[in-house]
């Protein structure tokens, strides 16, 4: 099944680059990044988005590694510098806001809001896979997302979220904090980014924890 993931590069005001949800890296990508700046922050924003952190650490040994709580339990061998939380660290305070999502059973994630571009950056809180998605002709992908998960052309949280919320009140508080941000677009790890009606589409996708 062709299920790809997107990495996001954010340039901070001082010129440092932050890589969010590291993807596979090779010499060609390293050269492309070098034309933009230097990676100083490696961010594993969720407990399913850490697989290539070690590769990026080898490519950028002086970078600081930040991980979502829970990753350290899944990868006890992974070196990291700091755990992410609800407060932005000094490295990007005033530029990027963040929320550690609580109230979930199987999946953990930190949401980020880049103020200057008014962009919300998520991993699994929204997946937007459908007819326009690259790789949409994959038969297994379409079977699972359309027939099983009923998420085809319908942005929703990842199936791991839908399996159950441990504390919907806590989750609702976190989601409302995210919706209070003044974002215009949503960059996500899986599927097509949301460029229009972002607030309304997210509120609809999160209807279950928001209204329960």
Feature-to-residue mapping (PLM):
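Conserved beta-strand hairpin/beta-sheet module of binuclear metal-dependent hydrolase folds
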Residues: 1-28, 110-114, 118-123
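Short, flexible loop segments at the rims of nucleotide/cofactor-binding pockets, characterized by
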Residues: 18-23, 42-45, 96-102, 162-167
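Active-site neighborhood of phospho(di)ester-bond hydrolases with catalytic His/Asp-centered motifs
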Residues: 19-21, 40-47, 66-68, 121-123, ...
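Short, well-ordered alpha-helical microsegments
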Residues: 26-30, 50-54, 107-109, 195
